[in-house]
Design a protein with these regions (language model features):
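Outer-membrane beta-barrel proteins
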Residues: 2-157
Length: 157
């Protein structure tokens, strides 16, 4: 299954590299500024993740809400993250990230986790950017910790 997930992710990322920017979208009154497609590795398990970005002001601070859905190794994940752009270095945006996730493990068990970490994104032109996030997480059901690396590409509208 891991080889299939990796192959699907590679195919999706290759396709995504050829897609151009689209028009802005609004869903349920919320403006979405980009879509993202990535691969997540959590303790040896891989998943293909599709997400979007909705910029909001939270207590006067501009943050990006990043809902995402992932599938891999028989698991279905629903994540809601937030990122805050800290600084820019050599054209790369450095961000602080945090979020929560609901994981439907092997389609018979639910797990809830919380994550915190950092991210970097670099615009490669024509509304596309490559990104990476690295987070530490705590699984409330298993009462253990893990790390997660997500690599991908995003497309601005």
């Amino acid at each position: 299954m891991k080889k299939v997930t990796t192959l699907l992710a590679a195919t999706a990322l290759a396709f995504a590299a050829f897609v151009g920017p689209a028009a802005a979208a609004t869903v349920a009154g919320v403006e979405l500024t980009d879509y993202s497609l990535g691969v997540t590795k959590t303790d040896g398990d891989y998943s293909l993740v599709v997400g979007t970005t909705a910029p909001i002001a939270l207590a006067g601070v501009e943050v990006d809400l990043k809902p995402a859905v992932g599938f891999g190794d028989g698991d279905l994940t629903f994540d809601l993250g937030a990122s805050y752009d800290v600084t820019e270095v050599f054209g790369a945006r450095i961000s602080a990230v945090a979020g929560v996730g609901l994981n439907w493990i092997d389609t018979d068990d639910l797990a809830f986790d919380a994550r915190i970490g950092g991210g970097v994104s670099y615009e490669v032109g024509d509304g596309k950017a490559v990104f990476a996030t690295y987070t530490f997480g705590y699984d409330f059901d298993a009462e253990d910790t893990d790390t997660e690396l997500r690599l991908g590409i995003s497309f601005k509208f």
